[in-house]
Amino acid sequence: MRRFVSRDSKKDFYLLYTLVFGVISFFIYYQFAGNGKSLVWSHDGIPQHLNSLAYYGRYLREVLHTIFVEHKLELPMWDMNIGYGSDILTTLHYYVIGDPLTLLSVFVPADKTEVLYEVLIFLRIYLAGISFSVFCFYHKNPKQATFMGTLIYIFAGWTIYAAMKHPYFSNPMIYLPLVLMGIDKIYKREKPWLFIWATAVSAMSNFYFFYMICIFMFIYAAFRYFGIFSERSVKDVLGWLVKFIGYYAVALMIAAVIFLPVIMTLFGTDRFQAENYVPLLYDKIYYEKYLGDLIGENMIQWGVAGYSAVAMAGVFVLFSRKKKYLDLKLGFGLLNLFLLVPFAGHVLNGFSYVSNRWIWAYGMMIAYIFVKAYPELFTLTVREKKKIFVMTVAYCVLALFAKAARTQRNMAGVLVLVLAVFTVTSFGNIFLQGKYMCGLLSALLVVSIMLNVSYQYSYEKDYLSEFAAEEESLDKLESNTDKAVLAAGDSGVYRYDQYGALPYDNTSMYMGTNSTAYYFSLANSSISDFFSEMYLNTPWEQHYENLDGRTILDRLASVKYFVISGDNFRYLSYGYNKEKGSAGKGKSECRAYENENALPLGYTYDSYIPESEYEKMDVVKKQQALMDGVVLEESTLPEASVDADNENIQYRMETGDGCALSKGAIRVTKEGAQLKLVFHGLTDSENYLIADNLDYDSLSPRELIGNSQWKKMSEYDQNKVLDEDSRWRYWKESKEAAMTVSSNDVTKTIKIFTDKYNAYSGRHDFLCNMGYSRSGVRTMTITFANTGVYTYDKLRVVSQPVQGIEEKTVKLGEEALENVKMGTNEITGDISVSEKKALVLSVPYSKGFTAYVDGKETKLQKANTMFMALELEPGSHEIRLTYCTPYLKAGMLLSVLGLVIYVMLVFRKKK
């Protein structure tokens, strides 16, 4: 300890830091391992995080193989195995590409990725501590204070909760201290290299957190300017602003090779453009629990504070000092204001849904407050100690005043806070030497961290149930669904669809198949637009599992196989008659059925439908129109005549208990209430339930009780309901709803997201395919999972005859692309057409594709909203498509230019 508290040696500091970090990290890891759990979150961790890391490792090894073995440089930019076919950079950037630490995956075999995944979780947290300590030492803070501040920073709610689910959520904790230190260096007229590179790496690492870093970068620079310079002028402010903008621009230019393609993709997503609900204030219970949650429970909207109670003692010490640390006091007030006002969470979350995922930055502030307050502990006056005592009493009373705030975790935090304040105010009386107080505060800090960890991973909290079992995560990606398709032994280029047979999304990416499932943060806007206009039964923009078994959509997407699990033959779509492969046993067995009339990757139309005419059509007519003509903005082909043979079926409604009807609305006051639609559907048809502009509003406990019933209740019972009502929005208000639709043993669910839901993308139109029926459907039963009011413009039952689909499919496939080969960033094939036609490729449209017909570049158009087409003259043709990530070349040029400017700056500084 004596060597540790000495002023000169930092080696001992990092040895002690590493030792304590290792002990606490082992304690965290043991909570998982001791319960047979891995650190892989089942929901997103398996299909996204772990899957992406394994993919990236293979990707890097393949690139190195082409360089050192094949002696050529090929960077794959497009992969048909990701969803319907996706850009690799823009899809995986959010998870792995750009993060320097994930480069380690190149050394780890795919089957050992889980080990690397878990190591990286703790390595990121460790580096965050190193980064914070470097920032503290730059500002000449003592090692004792820096040591404790570092532990406060890295072992808070954000890391023990959020970073375990999303490992890369620790990355901004590494970058922010370095960026802020870079700002300080510029103000001190030191070299700007740290600022430039910390900014560039954070921009390349993750666009989402980089946006937040930019906001805090600006706030910090403004605070530091007024804190450093006593003489100020508009000219001086503008001078510094120009300087910072210049260095910032250089950093962005360096990062542009990754940042530019990703940010341009982001701007095109529905999720980015959706208008989310932003309340003026949070609900009352949020404020009632706020103070206690800072050192205890997790708040809503990702406000996972959970800081050690020792940190709050540092806040009290800081505020007891008059006329000192004004910048930190104002910063503390500002960031607390951000947490208290929903609009701040809206802005800091990229003007999306309200979320406090920026709270890791609050953690740096509160940790640094403790670092600055620590030396003050030894010089506190009696008056200042009294102030600290009053603040402590006030805090404890307010933190535990509300019943909802008096949880075991919050009370434990308050107890540690009282002990910490007692320790702080006892110096000079009980503690006569600083080393003893340092030791006790450090012990309290570690105990506080351990308590927070223990509670977060307790059986009561049940947090660990969300994580996969040890060494099973990668096995789950080897799905029987993909194995059944591979067992068919088909070497062609095709897709498979499924219903209820896929345990996780994105398994095709791991198994090397082509599917209709996708689940990542960014999605191709052309796919999203198509699904929206087709009313595909999913509320997500970037998460889709299948095509709902819709025959026409399967045909147009070149789906050749349909997979079912167990004995779920009732979900097998029309036209899939022959079993071609299977995998697994019992209920987990999956069977792949072939459609012998499936369309290939490229098929042809002899006529087109102008986009302007297509947009006027009803959803069912749009679907049928796609079999008659290709939808293009303009074309020299003749216009198609659309043959619509669907029929809107008249029905009557039969309501069950807890379900009441009014014009355009269904009021549900009982979970599980049912509404029955009775009708006579067409024979030999697919049957759809279509909801136009479907929306949902939940009902509070008070709203569920009718006025007549309310008047009959006693005052006590009324008060009980009102008490529950006051807490309802925080705890139980549903931001989503589900309608289960059943017909002929087929059961499917329509999910509705409200504008309060974090994945809301603005979708309110749904078509639920209840499957093919030879004899005709007679009823559909809707079961409402949530109480509330379901509103709609139209609720329709439609029968879609399948008789003409086969004939139209055959026509589209008569003159098709043959000898299709998928190369690195390349698709090739041959085709012969007897007349002028449009060749449609069932590959998602992207500006990154360039088409060549017989070696000559040819205009490639967006077709059918989602796919691509090129017009062909009569005769035989060689088709070649090449791909380059949109804006990648511009990004590379900017990066080269940025590096050139950086080198020029270096030489200029040397001179």
Where are each of the predicted segments found?
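Membrane-interface coil-to-helix junctions
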Residues: 24-132, 151-173, 266-271, 278-302, ...
